[in-house]
Amino acid sequence: RGENITIIFINNAIYGMTGGQMAPTTLPGQITQTTPYGRNPDVEGFPVRVCEMLSTLSGVALAERVTVIDPKNINIAKKAIRKGFEFQKNKQGFSIIEVLSTCPTNWGMTPIEALDRVRTEMIPYYPLGVFKEGAIR
């Protein structure tokens, strides 16, 4: 419907707050508490690419994917979030900002290893960028 709201979706490819279960965005092959042998698309299905999916809908004014793995990308993320709130304030429609992030604890990695996983695994699967910006119809 083009509601004037902004969603900030933190995508760390896991349900970390509940013990590390598979999420809709868990990558193929990624091990979780509920996929101990890795996510198998033949069994659990493929991950959902949220921005790509929502950008096809009428009523969505902004769909953008960013990351927070280094200072440059943190600044890009801040601008994207601000843009989402501006769209909301100006009644331009629904905005979603997807933020690729880490979960070192439930990924079983050090923070440095987790940042590298975002670079080498998540960004290739979930490319950064603006998927839709502007008219909501």
Regions found by a protein language model. Give the residues of each.
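Thiamine diphosphate
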Residues: R1-G16, K79-K83
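Short, structured patches in soluble enzyme cores that scaffold and shape functional sites
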Residues: F9, R65-T67, E98-S101
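Short, hinge-like loop/turn segments at secondary-structure boundaries
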Residues: A23-L27, E113-D116
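Conserved thiamine diphosphate
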Residues: P24-N90
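Flexible, low-complexity linker and terminal segments
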Residues: K89-R137
